[in-house]
Amino acid sequence: MKEGIHLTYYHDAVVRCACGETFITGSTKKEIHVEICSKCHPFFTGKQKFVDTTGRVERFMKKYGLDQK
């Protein structure tokens, strides 16, 4: 392998979720921030909640002129 062209690999990279959960993994970044993880994702928790859907229906209605009045 060529010298000096490879990224530094961190075996103890910290992943931080918006819910407050942290865990250690391997990565080329020392610290990673994520919005959702297995501790708060609806698939893993079994709870139904909206994830990143704010305004999608409103934008669709506005885009196609389907305003409800």
From Swiss-Prot:
The keyword Signal does not apply. Its cofactor is Zn(2+). Keywords: Metal-binding, Ribonucleoprotein, Ribosomal protein, RNA-binding, rRNA-binding, Zinc. Zn(2+) binds at residues 17, 19, 37, 40. One of its GO terms (cellular component) is ribonucleoprotein complex. It holds the Pfam family Ribosomal_L31. GO terms for molecular function: metal ion binding; rRNA binding; structural constituent of ribosome. One of its GO terms (biological process) is translation. PROSITE patterns: RIBOSOMAL_L31. Binds 1 zinc ion per subunit. InterPro entries: Ribosomal_bL28/bL31-like_sf (IPR034704), Ribosomal_bL31 (IPR002150), Ribosomal_bL31_A (IPR027491), Ribosomal_bL31_sf (IPR042105). Part of the 50S ribosomal subunit. Belongs to the bacterial ribosomal protein bL31 family. Type A subfamily. Binds the 23S rRNA. This is Large ribosomal subunit protein bL31. The gene is rpmE.
